[in-house]
């Protein structure tokens, strides 16, 4: 059985509401230190935050629609890294995915990867709830070829929904141990979080982190 500390170390403690205040972001960082999460994930305009020792700083790019031009995403990602972001969670161009233009999807990811090279960690949000199984596989393959470090299920803002165990399992099967898999969007209970890990998630995006962790033994 996974412990509370082990699960916390897999969590991006997340606050991406557009109306988030500086004080709320500061409280998020304090909570991350208290709970022992891997990182905090905040909007690009909220990266000026004091972090507890050991807590990484993650942000988003092209969020939440993914429909921005690649050049705009690249500038946004580079600016976030310049502000101290350790990790960037970018949204794919979902319209290109729906077109079946997987070269276009890959090139969009490559533009962001070029703007934030290693050691910056690049996660690619594919909006799995909006995709068929075949599209999920193709999106994961495009992310891998483009040099991403993780594939991620969801923004949490798409009307199609958030993470599902089935999508996480398929994503994990597609990328194997070559990329990480982040489950995010609608994970509100301990049971849901554990199910995502069991399905193959190696990182979790949670906004209700405390309540999820409290369901586990310390």
Curated annotation (Swiss-Prot):
EC number: 4.1.2.4
CDD domains with a match to the protein in the record: DeoC
Active site per the UniProt annotation: 89 (proton donor/acceptor), 152 (schiff-base intermediate with acetaldehyde), 182 (proton donor/acceptor)
Pathway info: Carbohydrate degradation; 2-deoxy-D-ribose 1-phosphate degradation; D-glyceraldehyde 3-phosphate and acetaldehyde from 2-deoxy-alpha-D-ribose 1-phosphate: step 2/2
InterPro entries documented for this protein: Aldolase_TIM, DeoC, DeoC/FbaB/LacD_aldolase, DeoC_typeI
Main location: cytoplasm
Keywords: Cytoplasm, Lyase, Schiff base
Annotated catalysed reactions: 2-deoxy-D-ribose 5-phosphate = D-glyceraldehyde 3-phosphate + acetaldehyde
GO CC terms of this entry: cytoplasm
Function: Catalyzes a reversible aldol reaction between acetaldehyde and D-glyceraldehyde 3-phosphate to generate 2-deoxy-D-ribose 5-phosphate.
NCBIfam families tied to this protein: deoC (TIGR00126)
Protein name stated in the entry: Deoxyribose-phosphate aldolase
Native species: Kocuria rhizophila (strain ATCC 9341 / DSM 348 / NBRC 103217 / DC2201)
Encoding gene (name): deoC
